[in-house]
Regions:
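Short, acidic/charged, Gly/Pro-enriched secondary-structure junctions
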Residues: 73-101
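Helix-start/capping segments and mature chain N-termini
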Residues: 1-78, 102-288
């Protein structure tokens, strides 16, 4: 049995004892950023790239850096060790801190760090990774800085609820011009003409370490090329395969979108990527 622990400003404590001020700007305005780090076999997966993502968001929203990357790495390792969690994820959140109500940056406030660790059963999704999932689409009405992991995630919340009400696994966002960006918490890719296609890594999509891993390591391992180019549903419906990728779903085949079949099912390339991903995780996070 693991311990239900959290970290607040460098101090680890039982979750039931943790508290954050109602005047915290993250609570009042969503004035903060976050990052999610997967944990395998008691080890953080791709921790340094995830911390680079976090600091990039911190810099873009102009929150002063209180902790170094090295300190945050130590906090992650300590939280895993003291909680006893072997497989799960760590959610890190940094806000601008507590201040009187007002939209402009406060002159006197100290950024607040909170970290939570939860246990996850990845076997729950294993059957879906073999059979594939169905997803739906919705209008992408998010702001123009999706590459910043801010706490303002109401569009994703509503889109994910829409998926739940439709008995779908997730929801794809589509811009006004018809181009597909990503899902609520994963990148979206398709296999077409023996290449992997995905939306350009720009301000319209979240930074995604799994996507980066596929582009830089996994795709080359199976002799595939990743093309970053925006595409629409007409393009997707002519693809051989489609899949989501992210820290939670890993590599998840998509077999239907809005009740329309993609290719002939899971396909041949996605299982190869899944095997390459599993091997990479086992090398990076070996069992202790």
């Amino acid at each position: 049995m693991y311990k239900n622990l959290v970290l607040v400003d460098g101090e680890i404590m039982p979750a039931k004892e943790a508290a954050v001020s109602v005047h915290d700007r993250g609570h009042q305005f969503g004035d903060g950023v976050f990052e999610i780090v997967p944990v395998y076999n008691g080890r953080c997966f791709a921790l340094l790239p995830h911390m680079d993502n976090l600091f990039e968001s911190v810099i873009k929203v102009k929150i002063p850096a209180v902790y170094t990357i090295e300190e945050l790495i130590e906090f992650h390792e300590a939280l895993i060790a003291e909680s006893g969690i072997e497989n799960g994820e760590i959610y890190t959140q940094i806000t601008r801190g507590t201040a009187d109500y007002g939209l402009a940056f406060p002159e006197m406030s100290v950024p607040q760090l909170t970290m939570t660790i939860v246990e996850t059963d990845r076997e729950v999704l294993s059957a879906k990774r073999e059979s594939g999932v169905n997803i739906i689409t919705t209008e992408d009405n998010r702001w123009q800085l999706c590459n910043v992991n801010t706490l303002n995630r109401l569009p994703e919340v509503l889109a994910r609820q829409k998926a739940r009400e439709s008995n779908a696994f997730d929801t794809l966002f589509i811009r006004e011009n018809g181009k597909i960006t990503e899902s609520t918490e994963s990148s979206f890719m398709v296999i077409k003409d023996e290449m992997i296609w995905t939306h350009p890594d720009n301000n319209l999509v979240h930074k995604n370490i799994t996507r980066r891993l596929i582009k830089e390591r996994l795709a080359p391992d199976i002799d595939m090329q990743v093309i970053e180019k925006a595409f629409d549903m007409e393009f997707v419906l002519k693809a051989e395969e489609a899949f989501l990728c992210g820290p939670r779903c890993e590599i998840m085949p998509v077999t239907k979108i809005d009740r329309k079949f993609i290719g002939s099912g899971v396909g041949k390339v996605v299982p190869q990527l899944q095997a390459a991903f599993k091997a990479f995780v086992e090398r990076e996070c070996p069992a202790k």
